[in-house]
Amino acid sequence: QAKLPSSDITLEQKQSLLASTEIFGHLNEQQLAMLADQASCETFAPGESVVRQGERGDSLYLVVRGTLEVFQASANSSTSHPSRYVSDLEVSDTFGEMALCTGKARSASVICKSECILIEIERKHLLPLLEEQPEILETMGSIMAARRQQLKANQQQHAESRRLALIARMQRLFSLPRGE
C-alpha cells in the first residue's frame, strides 16, 4: 500500500482532532501533545485499502479528511474481496482499536471512498499513556463493545432483508399474493 506522508496537518491540528475523539477526549493537554507528536499522518488514494480483514494490526487510525467504507468478508468469500458493507467512517471517526488492543487479526477491511488523510497511532505510542492512565483501556473497551453491538444489529437487519427477499421471490415463483 502506498501511504504518503501528509505534512499539511500541524501538531496543533492533530492535538485538536485527538481531543475531539471519544477515546482520547479525556486526556490532558500534555498527554494529547505527546500523542500528537508521536502520531503520523498519511494520505491514501480513493479505492486504497487502509487495513485488510485477517491481517495483524498494531495501530489505530483517526480520520482527518475524507470518507472510508468498512467491509466484512463472509465466511465463504475471500478476504481480498470484501463482500458485505458495514458502515462509513468520516472525519473524527477512529478505527483499528480492536486489533491494537487485543492482538487479534483485523475484523474488517477499510477502504477509502475519497482521498483520505489519517492519523496513525501505533501501540508503542499508547503504552506510556496507558501506564499513566489505564482507564483509557476501559474507554476503548466500551467503544469496541458498542461497535460489536452495532455490527451484530447490522447483521441481523441484513439477514432479515435476505429472508424477506427470499419469501418475495418464492411468492412470485408460485404466483401467490404478497402479504402486506
Regions found by a protein language model. Name each.
Residues 1-180:
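Cytosolic regulatory regions built on CNB/CRP/Popeye-like sensor folds
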